[in-house]
Amino acid sequence: MNYIVIKIGGSTLTELHETTIDDIAQLKQQDLHPIIIHGGGPFINQALEQQGVDSLFEDGLRVTTDEVMSITSQILIGKVNPQLVSKMNDENIQSIGLNGIDAKLFDVEPLNEKYGYVGEPININTAVIDHLTEEYIPVIASIGRHKTSRHLYNINADTLAYKIAQTLNAPIYLLSDIPGVMIDNKVKATLNSEHIKNYIEQEQIYGGMIPKVQDAISAIEYGCQKVVIAAGNEAHVVERIRTGKGIGTTIVL
């Protein structure tokens, strides 16, 4: 099957351009099989603040205590995921909400105890994806469960998207709140591993963009076709990425 993994960042969900859902529907009509992964950071932040729960970050990852995990799962599974699924279904696009627990879509391996209940997805169940995408567009929340402890784990949505894309040998579109990787205040149309290494050394790629582009290269090395970072609030962003019409940053080896 010809898969395309589309990751929609939490900060992008409220500003997603109205044409994006239609673009995704068009992929299905072109015998392509989109898979949507979403985050929900701003919604989680708001819920934690409302409930008076401190939220700490370590190495760009949310330190996830039991209390933080409970709220995170409520927001991602109970609010963000069904809202996105409903938005698509309202446009007559057959979609189905999932997380790692459903149909044993994937297992979780804990990252490091300093992050609390933060894990990495493993054992992606491609048979489930193959079956579902024949009729539906999966919309996957970045929550999973440890096989042995049965405890829920928070997963970075980028990490989940990369893992699924490399498992399926698919391209990945990262729809973000930025137009791409900025170098000298301009979007860099194409980057490869050597470019990325040099720009990091020159501190032109910095902060949270460093792990994003490094993880992109790693995903490509393990099977992902390519990674494109683009702004989710751009009109027809998905179609423009697919047809190579000059949007965002394309990362290749």
UniProtKB/Swiss-Prot annotation:
Organism in which the protein naturally occurs: Staphylococcus saprophyticus subsp. saprophyticus (strain ATCC 15305 / DSM 20229 / NCIMB 8711 / NCTC 7292 / S-41)
One cellular component (GO) term of this entry: cytoplasm
Broadest EC class assigned to this enzyme: transferase
NCBIfam families referenced in this protein's UniProt entry, alphabetically: argB
Phosphoprotein in keyword set: no
Classification via PANTHER family: N-ACETYLGLUTAMATE SYNTHASE, N-ACETYLGLUTAMATE SYNTHASE, MITOCHONDRIAL
Lineage per the UniProt record: Bacteria, Bacillati, Bacillota, Bacilli, Bacillales
Site (Transition state stabilizer): 7, 212
Entry's EC annotation: 2.7.2.8
Known function: Catalyzes the ATP-dependent phosphorylation of N-acetyl-L-glutamate.
Pathway, per record: Amino-acid biosynthesis; L-arginine biosynthesis; N(2)-acetyl-L-ornithine from L-glutamate: step 2/4
GO biological process: arginine biosynthetic process via ornithine; L-arginine biosynthetic process
UniProt keyword annotations, A-Z: Amino-acid biosynthesis, Arginine biosynthesis, ATP-binding, Cytoplasm, Kinase, Nucleotide-binding, Transferase
Catalytic reaction list: N-acetyl-L-glutamate + ATP = N-acetyl-L-glutamyl 5-phosphate + ADP
Signal peptide: none
Residues that bind substrate: 40-41, 62, 154
Gene Ontology molecular functions: acetylglutamate kinase activity; ATP binding
Protein name: Acetylglutamate kinase
Transmembrane segments: none
Family: Belongs to the acetylglutamate kinase family. ArgB subfamily.
Primary localization: cytoplasm
Pfam families: AA_kinase
Cellular location(s): Cytoplasm
Keyword match Iron: no
